[in-house]
Structure formats: C-alpha cells, structure tokens
C-alpha cells in the first residue's frame, strides 16, 4: 500500500528566486505531519505546491508527488479540483485572506458543499448556517449574505 502523501525533492521558484529547495515528506494513513519553521522558510509554499495553488508564474518541480497513489504532477486542473476540499485540504495561516472579499461568506461556503458533497443550494445553505452557529458566530443566516472584511 502506498503512502497517503509522498513528496520527493520538491523545488519551487518565483522567477529566479528559489523558495523551496529539495523538500521531501511522506505521510502514511492515520499520521499527522506538522511542518515547523521560521517565517518565510517555505512552509506555506510547500503546501500550496502540493495543492497546486501556487501563484501564476511560480515554477514547481519534484521527482515525485503523489496523493493516494495519484501522480499530482500529471493530474489535470479538473482532477486537482476534485481532490481539493474533499480529500485534501489546507488550513491557511492568514485568516484575513482565507475568504475572498469579492464574494459573500455564504457563496464561498456553499460552493464547497455543492461541489464536493453534491448538496442542493438549500441543503448547502442550511449546513453552512449550522457550521457558523457551531463556532459561535451570531446571526449565521445574516452572516451568510455578508462579505468578509
């Protein structure tokens, strides 16, 4: 059985600036990996590279990058989109950039539920409101219609 996630010799650069050089990791099923390092050392860039969410113009290479045996280096954008949010996710460091200010909180939360869980708009909206209430956000129905800022 292959590892859940395997990355071998990851290199990421932005133009001529190297951001990650030779990163390798292996995560087996049931394991948790904690990546610790100084600010700017490449922790987030490594995660973004695995998720194929790097900014346009970034260059990503690796000897091997697989998730559940699937070659992430050869997977199409549509294939990566199916994995992200359902099978593979990232908790972003900066909460102010986790939600896009151009879209309502509700549209961003329900998109995930509709795309990955096949929920109807009504079911997704009810679930999103429930999730907001569970974490202590007041007036969740109202908040779903607001823009993050």
Question: Where would I find each of the regions flagged by the language model?
Answer:
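ABC transporter nucleotide-binding domains
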Residues: 1-149
């Amino acid at each position: 059985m292959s590892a859940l996630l395997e990355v071998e010799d990851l290199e990421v650069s932005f133009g001529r600036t190297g951001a990650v050089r030779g990163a390798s990791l292996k995560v087996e099923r049931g394991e948790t990996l904690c990546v610790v390092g100084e600010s700017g050392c490449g922790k987030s860039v490594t995660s973004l590279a695995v998720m194929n969410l790097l900014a346009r113009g970034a260059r990503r290479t690796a000897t091997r990058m697989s998730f559940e045996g699937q070659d992430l280096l050869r997977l199409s954008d549509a294939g990566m989109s199916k994995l992200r949010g359902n099978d593979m996710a990232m908790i972003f460091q900066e909460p102010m950039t986790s939600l896009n200010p151009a879209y309502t909180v509700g549209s961003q939360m329900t998109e995930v539920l509709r795309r990955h869980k096949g929920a109807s708009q009504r079911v997704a909206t009810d679930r999103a409101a429930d999730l907001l209430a569970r974490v202590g956000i007041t007036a969740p129905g109202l908040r779903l219609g607001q823009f993050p800022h």
